[in-house]
A protein has these predicted regions:
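Long, low-complexity, intrinsically disordered segments
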Residues: 286-311
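Primarily recognizes the serine-hydrolase "nucleophile elbow" in alpha/beta-hydrolase
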Residues: 148-202
Length: 311
């Protein structure tokens, strides 16, 4: 009798188990890619504003195909989320955010705010928002124009009250828009906005992700204290990530943490139970909503920083 047979058999079973796990991982990755590619439609539409010298406003949209078909048939109205990019960053660099909204049944609209022909943004101490007001107001004009044009493209969407989202400068645009046009806002999500103070009147819920970045600090008075946040329905998530980790080029740990908390926020704040992840022929684990992330607790630490982007 060969005494090594049981050991050899155990090693063989172990190798077989590892191969099965590797194969399953590949299958899961392929299924996720296939499901996302099929279920969510992405498109870039170019609009030109005749009231501003025919200015180009490119809009990236993301929408669930099944929800879009229902909207086209007049069965539902799509909730709308407007995603605003950071300074010098493209509107296409936040697909990890637009995908969360699309899975939840939103029409995600991402306008391109700055163009190569625009003058550079200059910091001016002592001026409103350290000289950023012209760029912020330009962003607000872009949003209104994009919404106006999107009503022609997809009339069966709720443009009267939108969810405003933005990173860095885009977060400032979002908060300023909400300040100027509160009746057009459903809720606000910002990722490390630095200049425009949060609204504390409690008219709508606010979720804000804050970085742990010594190079990007909010101006005094931008982020309310804990007591004000509690009274106004503001949720502040203090992360361990860098300012520029909060976009597609950031580490997976940062994006997955933000996705999870954002999905939980949308689940709790959206009253309609119909906005659920689309059924597919892939395992439930691939389409289930991410689990919750504790509030006010660092989500990760020591990520690899991206190249700094001026704000």
């Amino acid at each position: 009798m060969n005494r090594d047979s049981p050991k050899r058999g155990a090693r063989t079973n172990m190798k077989r188990g590892i191969l099965v796990l590797l194969s399953l991982s590949v299958l899961v990755a392929v299924a996720l890619f296939t499901a996302n590619k099929w279920a969510i439609r992405h498109e870039t539409i170019a609009f030109h504003d005749p009231d501003r010298d025919n200015r180009l406003v490119a809009v990236q949209i993301a929408v669930r195909r099944d929800k879009e078909m229902q909207a086209n048939a007049g069965l539902i109205k799509l909730p709308v989320a407007v995603l605003n990019h950071g300074n010098t960053v493209k509107n296409t660099e936040y697909s990890f955010l637009s995908t969360v909204f699309a899975w939840r049944g939103y029409l995600a609209v991402s306008p391109q705010h700055d163009l190569p022909t625009d003058p550079p943004m200059v910091t001016k101490v002592g001026e409103p928002y350290v000289g950023r007001l012209p760029q912020i107001q330009r962003g607000v004009a872009n949003i209104h124009f994009a919404i106006h044009e999107m009503q022609k493209v997809q009339p069966n969407a709720d443009y009267e009250k939108v969810t405003m989202v933005g990173h860095s400068m885009g977060g400032d645009i979002s908060m300023y828009f909400a300040k100027e046009y509160p009746d057009e806002i459903k809720k606000v999500v910002t990722l490390d906005n630095l200049r425009v103070p949060f609204l504390t009147d409690g008219k709508f819920k606010i979720l804000s992700f804050r970085s742990k970045d010594t190079h990007f600090k909010p101006d005094p008075g931008v982020v309310p204290d804990d007591e004000q946040c509690e009274q106004a329905g503001i949720t502040v998530v203090n992360t361990g990530f860098q300012h520029n980790d909060m976009r597609d080029t950031g580490p997976d740990a940062a994006k997955s943490s933000i996705e999870s908390m954002l999905d939980k926020f949308l689940q709790e704040s959206d009253k309609s139970g119909a906005l659920k992840p689309v059924p597919t022929n892939v395992p439930d684990i691939l389409t289930a909503s991410p689990g919750p992330v504790p509030l006010s607790v660092p989500l990760a630490s020591n990520p690899t920083p991206n190249k700094s982007v001026p704000n």
